[in-house]
Regions:
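Short gly/pro-enriched beta-turn/loop segments at secondary-structure junctions
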Residues: 2-4, 58-62, 114-116
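Conserved functional hotspot residues or short segments at active or partner-binding sites
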Residues: 69-170
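Conserved, well-structured core segments that form the ligand-binding/active-site neighborhood
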Residues: 1-13
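Glycine-rich, aromatic-lined ligand/substrate-binding cores of catalytic
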Residues: 15-100
Length: 170
């Protein structure tokens, strides 16, 4: 960057960093069409990594990032494998769903009009939930169960992750 602008940080008065957004009594404004609520915002930082794979990340449903799957996944097998990891703050429920075009959310989701099997993430303790760890665990588990099926777009994964190599490390 050739020209660095002046930056002025204005502190927020009476802000308590211990509060979740829904504890502030402020209205929720969607930061993205596919982040309709706080729970999705909590889940998103880790589950957005699925965008760099051939998995459906819940787009084309009314639960984007809260569920994921593909036509080649066995929902029971994946649910059991993920729940056996005993990850903090989350359980995984087996689900079947069919991604569709949803105006204003997802025009052409991956596996549009195809039945997908996968899991829905159920937050059980948002204070214990580590979004990025969960996203990595989900990717590792799918890769272990379906090594010939899961594909990565390494360039996109590098951009999402912030450095190169994650798709190879999994």
């Amino acid at each position: 960057i050739d020209l660095i602008p002046d930056l002025l940080v204005i502190p927020v008065e009476n802000l308590k960093n211990t509060l979740w957004f829904d504890e502030t009594n402020l209205p929720w404004i969607k930061p993205s069409p596919n982040i309709p609520d706080l729970e999705t915002a909590i889940i998103y930082p880790g589950m957005c990594l699925l965008e760099a794979t051939n998995l459906n990340e819940g787009r084309g449903t009314y639960k984007p990032f809260k569920q994921f799957g593909a036509p080649w996944i066995d929902k029971q097998e994946l649910s059991i494998a993920l729940n056996n990891l005993n990850l903090s703050g989350v359980t995984f429920k087996p689900v079947s769903y069919t991604p569709i075009s949803i105006k204003g959310m997802s025009n052409n989701p991956r596996f549009k009009d195809e039945k997908c099997e996968g899991v829905e993430l159920i937050l059980t303790n948002r204070n214990a939930y580590n979004s990025v760890d969960i996203g990595i665990a989900a990717l590792k588990t799918v890769k272990n169960l379906y090594p010939e099926k899961l594909k990565f777009n390494s360039d996109w994964m590098d951009k999402l992750w912030g450095e190169s190599g994650l798709s190879y490390q999994l």
